[in-house]
Amino acid sequence: AFRFGLTNERGYGNTYRVLKNITGLWLLQGLKVHLPENTSFADMEEMTREGGKLMHVIDPDDPLFYNPEDMKEAFDSYFRKTGQKLPGVFSEYLLCAYESLCFSFRYHIEKLEQFTGRNIEVLHLVGGGSQSDYLCRRIASVCGRKVVAGPVEGATLGNILIQGLAMGRIRNIAEGRGLIRQACPLRTYQPVDAPDMTRYRAFLEMKKT
């Protein structure tokens, strides 16, 4: 567990779950500041679709991306460090960010499978990222697994559930989860496109350095 960088998180009823902290949409938030102020994440996804063929890849867990003053410059520094040409248009940065995040998710899922000896067949995506239809589809295809997206406010709903249990308004966790499913319809995504295995192998080589 130490070698894989895993930890444990305590939950309700003396339960524990294996936890791995990795970089997420922070990359896209950092790139967003280089776009007009009224640009939405939906606009960024549309730009990503215009990015053409994937030509760049990064390791989102590299220290360069932890808290840079300029995320685009952090990308450029990483490209220079790894011998990649700089993107010619901004949409290539976005495409690189989205696809590299999906590669990172796949990598860490495979590591979790090695560590636990269990196959992970379904990915549950909660929080703000679950609102992105594009991201959910890409995660499903790159990771080769079904993705269940939602709810968006997972932490808040979990807090409400536990308070309901403490107040006797909810009988047990199963009932609370059922109420959440009724209140927050989930979306399901299946793998559609094959991942770019050439770029994924390049990503794996980066993880070795």
Kindly give the residue locations of the regions a language model identified.
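Active-site core segments that coordinate phosphate-bearing ligands/cofactors
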Residues: A1-V122, Q131-A155, L161-M197, R201-K208
